[in-house]
Design a protein with these regions (language model features):
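Terminal amphipathic alpha-helical/low-complexity segments used for targeting or macromolecular assembly
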Residues: 1-129, 141, 239-255
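Structural signal for interior beta-strand "rungs" in well-ordered beta-sheet cores
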Residues: 93-237, 241-244
Length: 255
């Protein structure tokens, strides 16, 4: 994660130059350091973030509503304007790949590149890249097959749990969190910000929509297209994937 000493007054000057509406809290300090972008949930008063609803501890917050941040930037498109600001002040550092013990990585893998994150600029219709600041965490006993792609997180990390195994051609997108001992057959595609429990099987050529929450002990059949959350202990299959039965026990081998 980038960690720079940018003063609050420098960001405020940028906000004024670009004609944003803003409010300052009673504890505004022009020399307060804002040193990193952050998710709203994890933000502290030294962070810059964005939000569409709810409160945040961020020192600088782009949002569509007034809040208690030291500098609150008011905008109809918080994510887009947050991107414009952090692109100006916080260039991403190279991705760190943090590996546990006994990690095996196949040939021609791409691990730690930026993911496919863009936001449309409503003024001219162009697509603006969301800078990626997160890292990759690979647990113990992770095996990655040939031609895998695992992209770094945007503001948080992409996390692969202990004992995860992937076949060739698997794609796991930014911000995904994969639980322990999950298995991914060839050409499985996991979109961004998926959260998956433990002991799951993802069949060949199947896909999971972004931000889906997949429970533990879930079996996803070959070629399935998962477009919503999946509870624990079920078998899903089809396009779109549907629950077809209870998953009563762990699969014990791959043949």
């Amino acid at each position: 994660m980038v960690n720079l000493e940018i003063r609050l007054k420098d960001i405020l000057e940028w906000v004024k130059t670009n004609d944003y509406d803003y409010t300052l809290s009673n504890n505004y300090n022009p020399n307060h350091i804002i040193n990193c972008p952050s998710t709203t949930k994890d933000a502290k008063d030294n962070c810059i973030s964005f939000s569409f609803s709810g409160s945040s501890m961020a020192g600088v917050l782009f949002s569509s509503y007034e809040n208690n941040s030291m500098l609150s930037v008011l905008t109809d498109n918080p994510k887009l304007d947050f991107i414009k600001c952090v692109t100006e002040f916080y260039p991403p550092e190279p991705c760190d790949i943090i590996q546990g013990e006994n990690v095996k990585i196949g040939k021609n893998c791409s691990i730690g590149s930026s993911g496919f994150g863009v936001v449309r600029d409503s003024k001219d219709g162009s697509w603006i890249e969301f800078p990626h600041y997160g890292n990759i965490i690979l647990g113990n006993n992770v095996w990655l097959g040939d031609n895998n792609t695992i992209t770094r997180g945007t503001l948080g990390d992409t996390i692969i749990g202990n004992g995860v195994k992937t076949d060739c051609g698997v794609h796991i997108a930014h911000n995904s969190i994969i639980g322990d001992n999950c298995m991914f057959a060839a050409k499985a595609m996991i979109a961004g910000s998926v959260i998956m429990g433990e002991n799951c099987w993802v069949g060949p050529c199947s896909s999971i929509i972004n931000k889906a929450v997949i429970g533990s002990n879930v079996f996803i059949g070959i070629g399935s297209n998962v477009i919503k959350d999946v509870p624990d202990n079920v078998v899903v299959a089809g396009n779109p994937a549907k629950i077809i039965k209870e998953n009563k026990g762990l699969w014990n081998s791959v043949k």
